[in-house]
Amino acid sequence: MTQLSEPVPVSLAARRSLWQRVARVWPYFSGSRAGWALAIGATIVASATEPFVPALLKPLLDRGFQRDSFNLWLVPLALMLLFTVRGLSGFLAQFALAKVTNDGLLKLRGAMFDKLLSARLTLFADQSSSAIANTVVYEVFNGSSMLINAIMKLARDVLTLLALIGYLVYLNWKLMLVVALLFPAVAFVIQVLSKRLYRLTKESQTATDDLAYVVEENVMAHRDVRLHGAQAGQASRFNHLSNSLRRLSMKSTAAYAGMSAITQVLAAMALSAVISIALLQSAENTTTVGGFVAFVTAMLLLIAPVKSLSDAATPVTRGLAALERGLDLMNLTPDESGGSFVKARAHGDIEFADVSVIYKADAAAALDQFSLSIKAGETLAIVGASGSGKTTLVNLLPRFVEMSSGNIYLDGQDLRAWNLASLRAQFAFVSQHVVMLNNSIAVNVALGQPVDRARVTECLAAANLSGLLAELPGGIDTILGHNAMQLSGGQRQRLAIARALYKNAPILVLDEATSALDTESELAVQEAIKRLTASRTSLVIAHRLSTVQHADRIIMMEAGRMIESGTHAELLARNGAYAHLYRLGFRNT
């Protein structure tokens, strides 16, 4: 199976430092300077309020209960003001953070989708559609939310720690030395367990892709699975992958929980030491009750940010791992490359010169030193057994497949010299595998071009779809739904023919385009195709005699080579491979 999670080895990604990994995603989230400024400013204010809680306790305990020595009413008023400022700052920081996250997510998703539209087509052969969709839609959303929130929480906790530590040093620098011993140990725990979390996160991404792919396969093949009674096998496959994902999730939870538990134990050890030393100091009258309570309170307030810092490794690690999948999709997938030659409308002369295509190093050539010249306006029929190279041949023309060697020329210009957009504008494709967008009939027919309603209706009529339009209340504005599945196979294929008619390209490729049509529909569509091919270069792959017998020329292919060429009558008279195929039933298939 294919999947998306393999572009960068985990070991290579793990060798990058935390700051190197953050630097990779920073350009997408750095645009909203006002948002960052507001979030950081509000975070600083919220963090600075933390030491005021124990600071209010000290005078209250030392002097507050002595008559006329301290105004007790100042304490509740100060607390109200303190928590009002704190709450408002938290709200502003969260709102600004949401803006930063969503702006960055919009930018990152846009860049990823642009990459999907411009990437080499090997991307879609190497990776499953579920893995790509999971990365673009879910991974970057979860990753950006986790990472940005974790970074700001990290900043808030660090600032809170600094504020509290400053207050602790002011209160009792000797006790603070004991607390300081906690930080190296916590840092060591975070460093060790973060590496494990990163590895487990990458493995979980792969397992999630595998599971999503099984679901995707069973949705697409639901009829075949039921027809062949394969439910038990597919359920076993799904359960095996689900259990693998569950085990990885439990390992991640154990690492996360272990990090939190160890940090709390270290904090408890430090607190116990502080209390012991404070008791010794109180015997020497160097520590007041208020000072001791304020110190312990401030130290207890330290536990939350320290624990949070230990927990921050999990969302930061997971967020970075998720976002790096999107970055790897963009950075490690090369774009399609084209030349600069542009022509508004090609004449239609095509030449293949010693073209070979080898998909895998250890596999036989799909095309083997293939040479052929096609004149402008000629209708060429291509026949041959399955796997003979017919579809590979026509997919070379718009560069959906790249040749391994040789040259292909359109109007005397090497295909690689053509601008890709200009090159592909010269071709209209109709294949047996029809893909329609979840949009209106009009938009699907005019795909990539402005919608001319009269022209759309004309093309639909030429493709024998007038009857269907009359049955639809919305006419050409009817939404087709997922791949137009409410239409029959023949109707979808005729819709693809209408799309080709609308494009009005100088070169037409029909890849078994009438294979799903009934006899009545085929006769109507054949007439439309005959009109369509009258002034165009046409390449027709078909298994039906009616599709090829009127072609100007027929070529017979076998194992990536052309073994015969001529008209239908000439090839029958030659009594070779084509005549043999014809006698085996080609005329009836």
Swiss-Prot record:
Its main location: membrane. ATP binds at G384, A385, S386, G387, S388, G389, K390, T391. InterPro entries: AAA+_ATPase, ABC1_TM_dom, ABC1_TM_sf, ABC_transporter-like_ATP-bd, ABC_transporter-like_CS, ABC_transpr_lipidA, P-loop_NTPase, Type_1_exporter. It is an enzyme of class 7 (translocase). It is a multi-pass membrane protein. PROSITE patterns: ABC_TM1F, ABC_TRANSPORTER_1, ABC_TRANSPORTER_2, MSBA. GO terms for cellular component: plasma membrane. GO terms for molecular function: ABC-type oligopeptide transporter activity; ATP binding; ATP hydrolysis activity; ATPase-coupled lipid transmembrane transporter activity. Residues 350-584 form the ABC transporter domain. The chain crosses the membrane at residues 37-57, 72-92, 151-171, 173-193, 260-280, 286-306. Residues 37-318 form the ABC transmembrane type-1 domain. PANTHER family: ATP-BINDING CASSETTE SUB-FAMILY B MEMBER 10, MITOCHONDRIAL, ATP-DEPENDENT PERMEASE MDL1, MITOCHONDRIAL. Homodimer. Belongs to the ABC transporter superfamily. Lipid exporter (TC 3.A.1.106) family. Involved in lipopolysaccharide (LPS) biosynthesis. Translocates lipid A-core from the inner to the outer leaflet of the inner membrane. Transmembrane domains (TMD) form a pore in the inner membrane and the ATP-binding domain (NBD) is responsible for energy generation. In MsbA the ATP-binding domain (NBD) and the transmembrane domain (TMD) are fused. This is ATP-dependent lipid A-core flippase. The lineage of its organism: Bacteria, Pseudomonadati, Pseudomonadota, Betaproteobacteria, Burkholderiales.
